[in-house]
């Protein structure tokens, strides 16, 4: 219970200070006063005090000024402790007890107002501080990252003012001293060659000595890109000459079991006394292996997260199960053959397998193995083609790859993939495999802990017997994972491509990934991003990009697979000797590609792994695949980030492979960009340039890698674009909305195949966009070029001037187009454009001359567009006659006017036009002028052609933005200055996904950005200062008011009698001030007085 409080209030006098000090001095003395004739006794006082518990009474006198002297006493426990103070908050005299205190009312009214002001000021200051933090916190992060990299041993970056030095060709680091490393008695290289990136160590521990061994035993090092799991009970051990029984002896001596050989001199050990899942390593067993002189290298394995790239069973399509074929279909009695639309549809709408079968090519003699969760080897549609030598159970360490059955059939994936490749034909059951004459095996490796050793052992299984390895799995497609093969798996790829198939190289085919819905990018998958694999994407039945498909520059080609609910899926074998028509995802695409590869290898057994990739690039069909990102590279090939070079064409690949000459030896050149230590501010981008003129051994590119080290507070905000000397634009990395990692990229090799056939000589540009709120910093950029010194084929014609200014009406490919009789199958096939737009359908009958599926000449009544003949120009194009093109050229000369002979560029006049005031007022007119000024002379224009409209037009009568006749949905025609443009209803910024061409930007964009940034910064500073000033004024005012009030001072109240036995003892207070009339009131009891006026005279003298 709270104590009762009574206040005695008296009118201040001129000697208030003296009275206060006198009261404080007299508080230490004891005064006795017993009131016998008083009407108030001690018992009554105690009773009144009990009734007034938790109440506050005050005594007030009439004020002549704004201040009062108040004594506050606590009487709840009969211990009169009083406080004497002055106050200026009670500004009115309390006339009667029933009235409310005006001071209390004013205080209650002022409190909400004060709280509102405080909240407003806090919100204002908080918003300003947050804005300033967003501007500046990234700089701190960048400084910390720089300091960390410097502390990590990296050399400090050269100052920006230093003169730029030419790029240097990377030289492999010198080998460690012989005293520090063990020497391989066979003279073989270490676990990984120096140029292979170790994904588990970020490239930092490839040749690090550790007690005389290669690599770090027992610790995988720091890897920001790889999320490792628990430790397992298995080890990977390198024992030279272990085949002669030494590996078994080492395992026995240290309590291990030798599970088998991974590849040359590398073995898979297990220790059954070590926990199969542990968060900490088994250091004791690791140390024993390290101390054994027979062991060259040892490492405890950690589990990895690997996902199959298919989906939950979807409902079968309600569309017709039989498609009209435009080629002569073969007769199969398999029950599901009519539903295999991707093989028998014809008309250029399938993968053209039937003509290859008619040539007698069925994959006979080629061995394909499926790396997955097992294979139902006794399936009626698989058992005739099952090959036990191509099969193994890595999870259970036996030769039987039969899957583990459960209630959900979760291990059906491998059996489905195997049926796509080699399901038996004409057995009256289920489906037909693409290579139905090939042998198929399966490796059960996903139904357990997947470690680096498990992957390496699977990829290295019987490489002299197995020709093709098909994998439809990889790191999690969640849009936030950056992961790839470990040290052993990377070595397995190299061993396979250099030694497999008798030195011709094993074929590794990989599914590109199903993270499209999560906006994942397959360049963050180290398996599809590898030069050793053939990455395959998917296309739907209608030729669209599937919703699950990932876009990246490492995808080489495409096969058909599932789409939406209304589109058909893939037919194949299933668990329990059954069949399915609903195989989905890129998991279904990779086995189809493996089957086509088996057909190609049968037609030419001497093909190497690089030969196959060259053939895929040259024969893939872009036709009928709808993707707005289609473009042409520097040698004229059409390529897409979703489909690669197009749909795989089995018959054409077989035809080319029969006459194929082996490509020259692969050459490699690495260029290190100097002084790369740049900060990328938020929502901006920078462009780095690297001049290449030292790679004389690589003149015809195959794979290109940009190895980048970059730090960022949020990795998903980074976009990367690469531009080749031939002006081919490549998107290396797209934004990933789920990637919140702060790890950045540590020597991650972003790979591209889009510059295939180009020359690396010239200027390469790397454009880095930071679309987030935090700073980013790039510290390393290396370019690695793979290719040949001479053309891939002897009859290929070199193209000395590479440019993507390709001829719109012909084919500028660098290789030799093989012409054949136009009466063949391609002469009768229909190349379909946009689905549902009959006016876009080409007219093959109007073509007079064919060359490799491309029309070279149309008749007089037809229009030519993109190597096809049309009766009417397709949508987004307009008819352009030869005389009209010449008139446009003349008009353009008049528009450009005289050229300054002293100008360094013929475009100076157009640049001046682009900086005019009208351009600032209307960007569409500016773009129109730029396009007018950039029109070049048309050379050898066919008589009737279709030219592309401006992208803002749906239909047009010219190439300019001001020549639209109809607009795309969401836009409307508006007339400005006697010209008509298509304006969008709502203009939205596309900065998050647009590619900004720095070469076409003028300085005013940068100036506007800097001006806007400065203004925002000044506004935030002004608001902050105003908030601080207002808050300071309030604090100062409050403190000034507090100084006008004296602090509480203790006044001792002592009993009137020293006797302790009298319970009715009355406590009184002695005041040295003169007696004056005092009224006493209690706030919460208006009908009752605690003290009468004449009674207080005994309390206050």
From Swiss-Prot:
Disulfide bonds: 430-579, 522-552, 669-695
Stretch list, region Disordered: 1-57, 150-187, 886-915
Record-annotated active site: 372 (charge relay system), 413 (charge relay system), 587 (charge relay system)
Entry's transmembrane regions: 119-139, 1014-1034
Cofactor(s) it depends on: Ca(2+)
EC number per UniProt: 3.4.21.75
Record's catalysed reaction(s): Release of mature proteins from their proproteins by cleavage of -Arg-Xaa-Yaa-Arg-|-Zaa- bonds, where Xaa can be any amino acid and Yaa is Arg or Lys. Releases albumin, complement component C3 and von Willebrand factor from their respective precursors
Tissues where the protein occurs: In adults, isoform 1-CRR is expressed in CNS, fat body, and female reproductive tissues, and in embryos, in anal pads, hindgut, developing antennomaxillary complex, oenocytes, clipeolabrum, pharynx, trachea, CNS and developing posterior spiracles.
Keyword Iron among UniProt keywords: no
Compositional bias (Polar residues): 38-57, 901-915
UniProt record similarity statement: Belongs to the peptidase S8 family. Furin subfamily.
Function: Furin is likely to represent the ubiquitous endoprotease activity within constitutive secretory pathways and capable of cleavage at the RX(K/R)R consensus motif.
Annotated protein name in UniProt: Furin-like protease 1, isoform 1-CRR
Protein's organism: Drosophila melanogaster (Fruit fly)
